[in-house]
């Protein structure tokens, strides 16, 4: 297939974890626009985390196809294509493999046999981009959860990916650390033209996105821009999603527009 504007395409993808189990994904089709921030949202059991597993090859489709840069992903080409995709998981403690920060960032580069001089340069550049270079010699237990997630992002950036997947990467952070991490992701996306895919149950995080896919019971429930999705905010509550605080307040005030950021709410008040 030919779609120059999409980096990842799901075409009629179905998936079940066991042959005698019900399908977790049912005939799912969507496009991930290149260079944009796509948020895939849904409650627990909606299928969103399974999508992430299929994208990085932890699981394989039962039927349908997944395309990466117009190439159908197969067993023969997967490892080559997978190198373009980085992922940051939910629990920062489960991602740290190095004894100190700089060794953790270097780990993936060692696996790719990157020469030592280039490795040193890439590690320093990646840590500088996430404001963690001064902590390059810190042990993991000296870092906060937000700082550990910054190191996880640095580890991904050092590999020069085209796509970064955030799989519930902010869910264990406090509100300030969460917002700081989202601000960092926005900066990284802008500076490197990286495609961001955030997998989340938090609609507040989806407000950051250019493109939103809402999953429910293994199917695509809604898809569109953040404005288009939140203009039908009440429908989202019927599938178990909690509306972001600014939208709740906006509705309580009787205003017409459903989509409203925190900054927009302050302006209205």
Curated annotation (Swiss-Prot):
- Kindly list the places in or outside the cell where this protein is found, as annotated in its UniProt entry: Cell membrane
Kindly indicate whether the keyword Secreted belongs to this entry: no
Enzyme Commission code: 7.-.-.-
Q: Which residues form the ABC transporter domain?
A: 8-242
Primary location class: membrane
Do the record's keywords include Membrane? Answer: yes
Q: Where does ATP bind?
A: 42-49
Please indicate which superkingdom the organism of origin belongs to.
Bacteria
SMART domains membership? AAA
Q: May I have one GO cellular component term?
A: ATP-binding cassette (ABC) transporter complex
Q: Name one Pfam family in it.
A: ABC_tran
**Keywords recorded for this protein, A-Z:** ATP-binding, Cell membrane, Membrane, Nucleotide-binding, Translocase, Transport
Molecular function GO labels: ATP binding; ATP hydrolysis activity; ATPase-coupled transmembrane transporter activity
Provide the membrane topology annotation: Peripheral membrane protein
Q: Which family does it belong to?
A: Belongs to the ABC transporter superfamily. Energy-coupling factor EcfA family.
The annotated subunit structure for this chain is: Forms a stable energy-coupling factor (ECF) transporter complex composed of 2 membrane-embedded substrate-binding proteins (S component), 2 ATP-binding proteins (A component) and 2 transmembrane proteins (T component).
**Function text:** ATP-binding (A) component of a common energy-coupling factor (ECF) ABC-transporter complex. Unlike classic ABC transporters this ECF transporter provides the energy necessary to transport a number of different substrates.
Q: What is this protein called?
A: Energy-coupling factor transporter ATP-binding protein EcfA1
What organism does the UniProt record list as the source?
Staphylococcus aureus (strain MRSA252)
């Amino acid at each position: 297939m030919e779609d120059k504007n999409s980096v990842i395409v799901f075409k009629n993808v179905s998936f079940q974890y066991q042959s005698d189990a019900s399908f977790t994904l049912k005939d799912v089709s969507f496009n991930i626009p290149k260079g944009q921030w796509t948020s895939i949202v849904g409650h627990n059991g909606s299928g969103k985390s399974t999508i992430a597993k299929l994208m990085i090859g932890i699981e394989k489709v039962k039927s349908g196809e997944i395309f990466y840069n117009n190439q159908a992903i197969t067993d023969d080409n997967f490892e080559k294509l997978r190198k373009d995709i980085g992922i940051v998981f939910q629990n920062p403690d489960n991602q740290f493999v190095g004894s100190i920060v700089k060794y953790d960032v270097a780990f993936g580069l060692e696996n790719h046999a990157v020469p030592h001089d280039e490795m040193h340069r890439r590690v320093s550049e990646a840590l500088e981009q996430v404001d963690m270079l001064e902590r390059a010699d810190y042990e993991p237990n000296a870092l906060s959860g937000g700082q550990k997630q910054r190191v996880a992002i640095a580890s991904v950036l050092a590999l020069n990916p085209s796509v970064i997947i955030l799989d519930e990467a902010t869910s264990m952070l406090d509100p300030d650390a969460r917002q700081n991490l989202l601000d960092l992701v926005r900066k990284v996306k802008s500076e490197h033209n990286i495609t961001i895919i955030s997998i989340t149950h938090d609609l507040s995080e989806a407000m950051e996105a250019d493109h939103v896919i809402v999953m429910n019971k293994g199917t695509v429930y809604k898809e569109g821009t953040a404005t288009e999705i939140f203009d039908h905010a009440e429908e989202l509550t019927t599938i178990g999603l909690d509306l972001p605080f600014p939208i709740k307040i906006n509705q309580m005030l009787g205003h017409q527009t459903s989509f409203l950021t925190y900054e927009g709410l302050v302006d209205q008040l």
